[in-house]
Amino acid sequence: MKSFAACVLLLCALFFEQVFAVRFDIPASTKPEQVCIRDFVSEGQLVLIDIETDGSVGDGQQLNLYVRDSNGNEYRRNRDIAGEVRVVFTAPQSTSFDVCFENVAQVNGRSLSRSIELDIESGSEARDWNKIQASEKLKPVEVELRRIEELTDEIVDEFNYLKGREERLRDTNESTNRRVRNFSIAVIVVLVALGAWQVNYMKNFFRAKHII
């Protein structure tokens, strides 16, 4: 059973490497909206973001870059970028982060845009394995095995995080259901008590008027 689990983790490590690449265009506008790419990173993981754009500074458009996570931490804020840009940071906690761009048109009446190629690597994939191989004098096979081992550990950690998150969400859901049930019971009790009071009040009223 343990060997089967190890095989599953190895396959996951081979097929779900933490590398994300995308290419897209952003048109320039005098009132631009941010275009964001979101990714997830675990606590303590290294994140490497490589950005390559066409165009140049002063070509009538200003491409701005923002890198921030869902907790409000900002890792990079660059204005008027062009060419190649690299962003490196270590995640302080497990969270999602956004790589956002906005393209500001500096000249009216012209249709301009920037092409962006974005590569995001995290965890073991963000490490410089050539440097590690040279410094520790490892064989290529040893480097690959070590990389797969670290990637497998990261997958296990992410599974554990997702499991813990699912448990927290389940606890929250159960707590919400319990509160809704208690509130519903309280509303029913209040309505029954109010109905009984109204019936008693009407009986006393009719008796006072000698109707009954």
UniProtKB/Swiss-Prot annotation:
Residues 22-181 are lumenal. SMART domains: EMP24_GP25L (SM01190). Residues 1-21 form the signal peptide. InterPro entries: Emp24-like (IPR015720), GOLD_dom (IPR009038). Residues 34-122 form the GOLD domain. It is found in: Endoplasmic reticulum membrane; Golgi apparatus membrane. GO terms for cellular component: endoplasmic reticulum membrane; Golgi membrane. Keywords: Endoplasmic reticulum, ER-Golgi transport, Golgi apparatus, Membrane, Protein transport, Signal, Transmembrane, Transmembrane helix, Transport. PROSITE patterns: GOLD (PS50866). Residues 203-212 are cytoplasmic. One of its GO terms (biological process) is protein transport. It is a single-pass type I membrane protein. The chain crosses the membrane at residues 182-202. Constituent of COPII-coated endoplasmic reticulum-derived transport vesicles. Required for efficient transport of a subset of secretory proteins to the Golgi. Facilitates retrograde transport from the Golgi to the endoplasmic reticulum. This is Endoplasmic reticulum vesicle protein 25. The lineage of its organism: Eukaryota, Fungi, Dikarya, Ascomycota, Saccharomycotina. The gene is ERV25.
